[in-house]
Amino acid sequence: MGDWGLTETSMDNYEISILSHVAMSPSRHNNLMSAYSLPSSKSSYSVISAFCTEDNIPQCISYINQELGSLGLAAHIQADPPGRASLNAAPALNAMYELLQIHRRSMNNVEELEKEQLKKTSTLEHMQTSNSRLKDQLELSIREKSGLHETERQLQLKLKTLQSCLKTEKDEVQKLQSIIASRASQYSHDAKRKEREAAKLKERLSQLLVDRKDKKLAIEMLNSVGRSDGKRSHWKTAKATASREAEMYKSLLSDYEASQRALMLENAELQKVLQQMKKEMMHILSPCPPLNRGGSAEESQELGDSDREERSAETSRETLDQSCEHAREQLTNSIRQQWRKLRNHVQKLDNQASLVQNQPPSNAEVIPLETHEHEVERMRLEVQQCKEFIHAQQQLLQQQLNTSFDDETAALLNGCYTLEEKERLKEEWRLFDEQKRNFEKERKNFTEAAIRLGREKRAFEEDRAAWLKHQFLSMTPFADRMRSSSSDGQSALSVKSEPEIRTSSSKAPPVKSSAYTTFSTPKSSKSAAVPSTIDVCRTLRLIPDYRESSATEDEESWLKSKSKVCSSDLSIFSLDEDKNPLT
């Protein structure tokens, strides 16, 4: 039992030391560690001497009992009899055990409190972080709120402006409605007034017709023959006359509608013809590939075109004596024929200009055949003379080599002959080089003259084609639209031709330059009056001259109306003037 008690007390002391080591403060723990570092006897003696000595054991026991009582412990430590200075072990151990249990419970409570404190600190940190996050969110929401307030303010301003605009628009709508209502009432009053006037006019017309019938002097027929169908004629009542007037008006309206439809069809056909003429004119005036046609064929075509023009002119004069429909068809056919002739003529001019422009420079720079043959013959003679001279020299040298002389004489003679021949050959070579240089110079001059002549000829052909084209276009209905562009192109041609005329007059032979400079491109006079549409149609033989025709006054008025229609329809050619220039 004693051993067990000692082991138990030692274990309890070990646990107490561990618990005290865990629960003590750092300063107390350091003091305790320093106390443990001393020997055990000295440490126990110092601790006991600090609180209890052999003299004050009863006082210490009473003090401990009081403390245990204050702590609520039932066990009390009792002292031994006075003869023995020791304690009763069982109550002391029980008190120590209870103290250890209390200490353990307090340590557990301390650990739990520490855990709770850690939890509370973690929750506090979490709450602080959440609080900071919520503060940031609050600031962000405040900023968003301020932005929303600003947008709301802007929207309110826009709403106010829109409301003001809506108010002004409503005022304008009300004003317009009032104006429309006033005008509608005015129009209704005008319509009623017109209806009343029309009714009055109808009554007046019917009255005039009735009065005219009543005032008409005629013989009354007795026992008149009945109608062929055996029916009786209706009485001449106001209703019958009104129905007949309505039928008359209906017939007049139907006639007017039929004539209007015929005029619309005629106008559509003429517009189609003019559109086709416009397309073909734009196609012709655009650059087209050249066609190889002979001069005789072109002349025969021109003669055929002129004959056809005369025939079409005669037919156009004859058509005036026919009916209106036949005259319209003939006029359309004559327009188409004249347009075909115009197209063929413009194509022919374009082909001539393209042939002149596309002519290769080798053909334009060719030397005349007679001069070329003369120069070749002269060069052949010179080459033949040189060959004969060289052959004679070779024969003489061979003869000298074949003759038998002494070595010294032969050497002297050969030396003399070779020196003389060398001098003579040098002189001949010098003359030959000089002749060659002169010949090259003459050939170069002749080639330049031929090239210049070809260029002058080509420029002459271009000026001639441009002049013919200008003269032709000045006779067409497009003269007023082509005047500015043709004047610009013509001035460019004149500016281009003046330096060429000066160079040709200074370098070319006098006969050729005079033949070229005698031609001058005519310039369009600005003071010329612009022809009218009737003059243009008469020039193109679309309509004959009034002096030559023997038509009546009705036919003349019809021709004037047709000329007005033509002048109004010819304005469609100016639609694509900027996109497709005529020059």
UniProtKB/Swiss-Prot annotation:
Belongs to an adhesion system, which plays a role in the organization of homotypic, interneuronal and heterotypic cell-cell adherens junctions (AJs). Involved in cell movement. Acts as a centrosome maturation factor, probably by maintaining the integrity of the pericentriolar material and proper microtubule nucleation at mitotic spindle poles. Residues 108-220, 255-333, 420-453 form a coiled coil. This is Afadin- and alpha-actinin-binding protein. Keywords: Cell adhesion, Cell junction, Coiled coil, Cytoplasm, Cytoskeleton, Microtubule. Residues 504-515 have a biased composition (Low complexity). One of its GO terms (cellular component) is adherens junction. Belongs to the ADIP family. Residues 484-494, 516-527 have a biased composition (Polar residues). The keyword Coiled coil applies. It comes from Oryzias latipes (Japanese rice fish). It holds the Pfam family ADIP. Residues 285-328, 480-527 are annotated as: Disordered. Residues 305-328 have a biased composition (Basic and acidic residues). One of its GO terms (biological process) is intraciliary transport involved in cilium assembly. It is found in: Cell junction, Adherens junction; Cytoplasm, Cytoskeleton, Microtubule organizing center, Centrosome, Centriolar satellite.
